[in-house]
A protein has these predicted regions:
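Non-catalytic structural scaffold of enzyme domains
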Residues: 1-127
Length: 127
């Protein structure tokens, strides 16, 4: 059975993602790592901090030690730290908004971004 570790910055989308995994990827074991202090720290500091990067790297290492096949970064606001985590793990890491951004670039030249949290805008636009 394949395993995916999801790094969350809030429990808000946990149940929805669990339901999607169960429906679309029933053969994949979903492991959840939740640190709701990450998003608050991003908001307070208008971006990622060394502490966020450090914790994200620890979570990436923990996920890898669990033998996951993929790490999914669920929060765009910490996307820049996920880029650093990618350099510290051997398993693939996917930012949740990467496939959407890649598809948007293929479809058009003017791309609008709508976000539920202001701290998402910069990392999402930088994709």
């Amino acid at each position: 059975m394949q395993k995916v570790a999801v790094i969350h910055t809030s429990p808000v989308s946990l149940n929805e993602l669990k339901a999607l995994f169960a429906e679309l990827l029933p053969e994949v074991e979903m492991i959840n790592i939740i640190d709701d202090s990450l998003l608050e720290e991003v908001k307070r500091n208008n971006g990622i901090t060394p502490g966020i990067v450090s914790r994200m790297c620890l979570y990436g290492q923990a996920a890898q030690s669990m033998g996951v096949d993929l790490i999914l970064n669920q929060c765009s606001s910490v996307g820049e730290s996920a880029d650093i985590v990618k350099q510290t793990v051997t398993c693939p890491l996917l930012k949740i908004d990467e496939p959407m951004a890649e598809e948007a670039v293929q479809l058009g030249t003017k791309i609008g971004v709508i976000a539920t949290v202001g701290s998402t805008m910069k990392p999402s636009c930088n994709l």
